[in-house]
Each structure stands twice: as C-alpha cells, then as structure tokens.
C-alpha cells in the first residue's frame, strides 16, 4: 500500500466515514476506527466533540492540511463579508490542489498535491508548484504538455465515481480547466455531509 493510500485509509478509519466516496475505503467493510480498541462502542459526542469532528472531516477532505493553514483559511473567511461557513468552503475549493482534483486530472486530493509539487501544472500559462495557491475566477489550469500522458492522469479521467462540478469547465482532451466561479456549500459534490457552520462554532468558542 502506498503512503498516499495509507493516509486516505487512516483518515477514513479515524472519522468512521468514507469522506471521498471511494469504493475501496476501509469503512465500507467495518464500522469502527483504527487500532485494537476501535471496536468499542462510541458514546454520544459533546457539543465540542461534534464541532471538532466537523473540523477534522473538512480538514481531512483537503488532504489533512495543517491546523495552522486551516485556521489561517478560517480567519480569512471570517474577515470577509457574508456567511463565514460559506466563505470557508469557497476558499478551500479555490485552492489549486482542490481544483486539480475536482477537474479529474488526478484520482485523489493527495495525488493532486504531489502532482503540483512535482511541477506538472500551469496556471495561466505559468508553472505553479504551490498546493495552496489561491485561484481567482477565470484562472486557467492546465496539465503541462509532457505530463499529459502520465498513467495517473489517464487513469483519473476515466474515474466514474465522481463528476466534475459545474463551477469548473474542463476539456479533458486538452487537459485544461477554467475556474468559473466561487462555489457555495450546496454546489460542492462532497461524498458526505460537511458542516462548516460547526467549524465556525468550534473556532468561535
């Protein structure tokens, strides 16, 4: 099992949910967490526990980004006008790694981060190797020419388990995606329920 596959399985088991909707998720086979004590019945979570779980789930979905980076994103969402939870989703979905994943250029969010790190992606014609790079509406993301025939790319395009959301236009023949608009929670095709309002409550304590 690769390190990326192990990380995905660990997050799913820890949360007890198949947060990416993957057929091979370990939680499809069992209903308890990792470790020798994973089979013990879980008690009812406190309000804090529910809020913490919501944060862990959202943070985990985007590749288990660091607490420092996630909190920084939340604080930016809180400073903006409008609903903080909706702003948070919009900021997370405008990350370059999220758009590369949503566009089906790679099979997983973890693969997206590595793909970007290795210099396989251009934004508006220039190479960008920063996972958290913030896209603006109208930005064009393209797989670099020499990378278009990589097995990981060809495999991802064929994945039937997820569709490209309508806030991203994709041409898989050219391997080009345009970020059309900032989505709200209802626009994002999460495989499980995400509750950014609980994340706001967590950080507002």
UniProtKB/Swiss-Prot annotation:
It comes from the Bacteria. Keywords: Ribonucleoprotein, Ribosomal protein, RNA-binding, rRNA-binding. Belongs to the universal ribosomal protein uS4 family. Gene3D superfamilies: Ribosomal Protein S4 Delta 41, Chain A, domain 1, RNA-binding S4 domain. Part of the 30S ribosomal subunit. Contacts protein S5. The interaction surface between S4 and S5 is involved in control of translational fidelity. Residues 1-16 have a biased composition (Basic and acidic residues). This is Small ribosomal subunit protein uS4. Residues 94-157 form the S4 RNA-binding domain. Transmembrane segments: none annotated. Pfam families: Ribosomal_S4, S4. Residues 1-46 are annotated as: Disordered. Disulfide bonds: none annotated. GO terms for biological process: ribosomal small subunit biogenesis; translation. One of its GO terms (molecular function) is rRNA binding. One of the primary rRNA binding proteins, it binds directly to 16S rRNA where it nucleates assembly of the body of the 30S subunit. With S5 and S12 plays an important role in translational accuracy. One of its GO terms (cellular component) is small ribosomal subunit. SUPFAM superfamilies: Alpha-L RNA-binding motif.
């Amino acid at each position: 099992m690769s390190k990326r596959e192990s990380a995905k399985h660990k997050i799913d088991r820890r949360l007890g949910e198949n947060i990416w909707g993957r057929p091979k998720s370990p939680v499809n086979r069992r209903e308890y967490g990792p470790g020798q004590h994973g089979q013990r019945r879980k008690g009812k979570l406190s309000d804090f526990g529910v809020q913490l779980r919501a944060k862990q789930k959202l943070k985990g979905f985007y590749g288990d980004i660091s607490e420092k980076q996630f909190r920084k994103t939340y604080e930016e969402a809180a400073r903006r006008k409008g609903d903080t939870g909706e702003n948070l989703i919009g900021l997370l979905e405008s990350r370059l790694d999220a758009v590369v994943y949503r566009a089906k250029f790679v099979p997983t969010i973890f693969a997206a981060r590595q793909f970007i790190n290795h210099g396989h992606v251009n934004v508006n014609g220039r190479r960008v190797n920063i996972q958290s790079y913030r896209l603006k509406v109208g930005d064009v993301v393209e797989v670099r020419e020499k990378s278009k025939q990589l097995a990981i790319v060809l495999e991802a395009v064929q994945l039937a388990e997820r569709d490209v959301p309508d806030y991203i236009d994709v041409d898989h023949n050219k391997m080009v995606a345009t970020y059309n608009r900032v989505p709200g929670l209802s626009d994002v095709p999460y495989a499980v329920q995400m509750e950014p309002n609980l994340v706001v409550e967590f950080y507002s304590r």
